[in-house]
Regions:
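Class I S-adenosyl-L-methionine-dependent methyltransferase module
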Residues: 1-124, 128
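Signature of N6-adenine DNA methyltransferases within the class I
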Residues: 1-28, 120-229
Length: 229
């Protein structure tokens, strides 16, 4: 039979586009709120981050603009406002004339739910992070992606795979309680351009295992190069 009370899978797409304007988000801050002008500024920055969701995906960190800002009165307050802003990413009604479901409205509603779920999941910390990261050398990256990696992951910027390694470590629990397991190219283990990243990982992380799978480690044509686990 079917198990009663089975929880829904915690799955979200991080590449959804924000439809609302930044002014719509900023309007969520009441005029009489403490530090209203500052909160509106932060919501505009957060909106700009989600506006890049189709390009950056799970590299997005909704709290990144707040982490180094001691003037923020309450991160929880901003997170609540962000949730309210994302909640506006839905149509007033899903039903058109003759009670026919409108495709555009339905898509917008699905986008809204995805943004809400993605924001919550990207703000979490996990005991186990497992993925096959995307591979893309810096020379082939979009300029916006280049700038983002340069600003936030300077030691890993030469390949998107290494950037995602850093992002996965961010998503893992602190104090050694989190484990990251990924598949990625193995050339960064010896190339000089990654020496700074290797050093900081050796100092700040515990390496449990690295397995060199080599060429054709997977049975698909795209895996015809050296990878590691």
């Amino acid at each position: 039979g079917v198990r009663a009370g089975m929880p829904a899978p915690q799955v979200a797409c991080c590449g959804l586009k924000v439809a609302a304007k930044p002014e719509d988000w900023m309007a969520l801050v009441p005029d009489d709120a403490a530090n209203a002008a500052y909160l509106r500024q932060e919501l505009r920055l957060l909106h700009a981050s989600f506006a890049q969701a189709p390009l950056l995906g799970s590299l997005l960190d909704p709290a990144r603009s707040l982490k180094n800002d001691l003037a923020t009165s309450s991160f929880d307050t901003l997170r609540d406002l962000l949730g309210r802003a994302l909640a506006t990413e839905r149509p007033a009604t899903l039903w058109g004339q003759a009670s026919e479901l409108q495709d555009d409205s339905w898509d917008l509603a699905l986008t809204a739910k995805g943004l809400l779920d993605a924001a919550r999941l990207l703000d979490g910390r996990y005991h186990l992070v497992v993925t096959n990261v995307p591979y893309l050398a810096r020379g082939k990256q979009h300029d916006t992606l280049k700038d983002y990696c340069e600003a936030h992951y300077p030691e890993a910027k030469n390949d998107l795979a290494n950037v995602f390694l850093e992002r996965c470590l961010e998503l893992s629990c602190d104090q050694g309680a989190g484990v990251v397991q990924i598949v990625m190219p193995q050339n960064w283990l010896f190339l000089a351009s990654y020496s700074a990243q290797r050093k900081q990982l050796l100092v700040n992380s515990t390496w449990c295992m690295t397995a060199l799978l080599g060429a054709k480690g997977f049975q698909t044509p795209m895996w015809d190069f050296n990878v590691q686990l």
